[in-house]
């Protein structure tokens, strides 16, 4: 079997969720959209369900996957519904939905639901992606709040630049949201992962941790709070070939690396088709049996190459760690000019194995 695999530590996931709840001082929806950021939505939700206040996904397909796997906790559709027919499924499967457009508000007002729906009304406070204008937001709240098909309303917005700790935009968004939502008797939801980790003055009834659940730092630097995160995914493989090159010889496509000295080259079974960044530069750290070795040459579809010259003990079969506790996925992403979100969500064919107390408990249940 090809040695590439992603190890998912479910106890670390639970630790990060508890941290999110503690930092928020509120209820927290665990965001498991995009297959839990590449970690496996069903297994992650199963691990978190005993203590999670609920989950959040992008669309009804992701929600139904969780329901079919036996997840009974609340599930919020972050993009709401795309067709009116989905409202029947939302009611049937007891899902919560965001309403972020006039069309969604109108459809909810006209829907004859077999059971009252829980709706999260979204205001655009400055991100300018989804959400109602402040005027339409208040009008929608007035329209929906007394309808028999609406069980409850939560007022929400989304922070656009909370991962920039020196940016005033987050405070401006929070003030705009508070000015509009003030006086509306409803729970609120404002804080995402960077909002929880970096903006302690913000307050809400529901937070929505996503990236932090998986142990990735949303900031370019570490803080007291991010230091408490535990990486959930460890991406591993092994060396599958070793060769000696004389000085002056190139490595890989395009000869991006040329040996300046006699160089011992290790080939690792991991490439961009697996989700490793294709344009990782020469020198990107790779952990070979606990020792950092530099990436050399261009990353191929199925393989990458590392300089083993200073690690003579490494040989075919030696274990390799691409990210995890070291190097951390956020640091690797920054070095490769991509986001940690992109790396985690980009794992396509790497098999996942689950470890940690939650995995043991689930298997023995």
UniProtKB/Swiss-Prot annotation:
Cystine bridges: which residues? none
List the active site. Answer: 33 (proton acceptor), 253 (proton acceptor)
Superkingdom: Bacteria
Residues where substrate binds: 129, 301
Which reaction does this enzyme catalyse, per its entry?
A: L-alanine = D-alanine
What does UniProt give as GO cellular component?
cytosol
Q: Which UniProt keywords apply?
A: Isomerase, Pyridoxal phosphate
* EC number(s) stated in the UniProt entry for this protein: 5.1.1.1
Q: What class of enzyme is it?
A: isomerase
Modified sites of kind N6-(pyridoxal phosphate)lysine: 33
Claim: Isomerase is one of the keywords in the record = yes
InterPro entries noted in UniProt: Ala_racemase, Ala_racemase/Decarboxylase_C, Ala_racemase_C, Ala_racemase_N, Ala_racemase_pyridoxalP-BS, PLP-binding_barrel
Name a biological process GO annotation: D-alanine biosynthetic process
* UniProt GO molecular function: alanine racemase activity; pyridoxal phosphate binding
Keyword check for Chaperone, yes or no: no
Pathway named in the protein's UniProt entry:
Amino-acid biosynthesis; D-alanine biosynthesis; D-alanine from L-alanine: step 1/1
Which prosthetic group or cofactor does it need?
pyridoxal 5'-phosphate
Primary role: Catalyzes the interconversion of L-alanine and D-alanine. May also act on other amino acids.
Which HAMAP family is this protein grouped with?
Ala_racemase (MF_01201)
Which family is it part of? Belongs to the alanine racemase family.
Q: Which PANTHER family match?
A: ALANINE RACEMASE (PTHR30511), ALANINE RACEMASE, CATABOLIC-RELATED (PTHR30511:SF0)
Q: What is this protein called?
A: Alanine racemase
Give the organism, scientific name: Xanthomonas euvesicatoria pv. vesicatoria (strain 85-10)
């Amino acid at each position: 079997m090809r040695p590439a695999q992603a190890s998912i530590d479910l106890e670390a996931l639970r630790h990060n969720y508890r941290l999110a709840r503690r930092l928020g001082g509120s209820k927290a929806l665990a965001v498991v959209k995009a297959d839990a950021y590449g970690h496996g939505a069903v297994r992650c939700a199963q691990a978190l369900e005993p203590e999670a206040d609920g989950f959040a996904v992008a669309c009804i397909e992701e929600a139904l996957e969780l329901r079919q796997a036996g997840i009974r906790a609340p599930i919020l559709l972050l993009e709401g519904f795309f067709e009116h027919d989905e409202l029947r499924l939302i009611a049937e499967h007891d899902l919560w939905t965001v309403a972020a457009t006039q069309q969604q508000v109108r459809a909810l007002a006209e829907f004859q639901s077999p059971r009252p729906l829980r709706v999260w009304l979204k205001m655009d406070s400055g991100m300018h992606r989804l959400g109602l204008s402040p005027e339409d937001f208040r009008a929608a709240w007035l329209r929906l709040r007394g309808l028999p098909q609406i069980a409850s309303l939560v007022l929400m917005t989304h922070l656009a630049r909370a991962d920039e700790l020196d940016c005033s935009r987050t405070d401006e968004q929070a003030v705009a949201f508070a000015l509009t939502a003030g006086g509306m008797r409803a729970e609120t939801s404002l804080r995402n992962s960077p909002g929880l980790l970096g903006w302690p003055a913000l307050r809400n009834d529901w937070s929505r941790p996503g990236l932090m659940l998986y142990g990735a730092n949303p900031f370019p630097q570490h803080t007291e709070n991010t230091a408490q995160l535990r990486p959930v995914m460890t991406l591993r493989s092994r060396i599958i070939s070793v060769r000696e090159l004389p000085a002056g010889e190139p490595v890989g496509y395009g000869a991006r690396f040329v040996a300046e000295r006699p160089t011992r080259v290790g080939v690792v079974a991991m490439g961009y088709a697996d989700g490793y960044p294709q344009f990782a530069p020469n020198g990107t750290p790779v952990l070979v049996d606990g020792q950092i070795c530099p990436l050399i040459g261009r990353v191929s579809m199925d393989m990458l190459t590392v300089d083993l010259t200073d690690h003579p003990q490494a040989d075919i079969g030696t274990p390799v760690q691409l990210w995890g506790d070291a190097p951390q996925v956020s640091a690797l992403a920054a070095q490769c000019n991509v986001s940690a979100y992109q790396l985690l969500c980009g794992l396509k064919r790497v098999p996942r194995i689950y470890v940690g107390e939650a995995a043991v408990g689930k298997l023995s249940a």
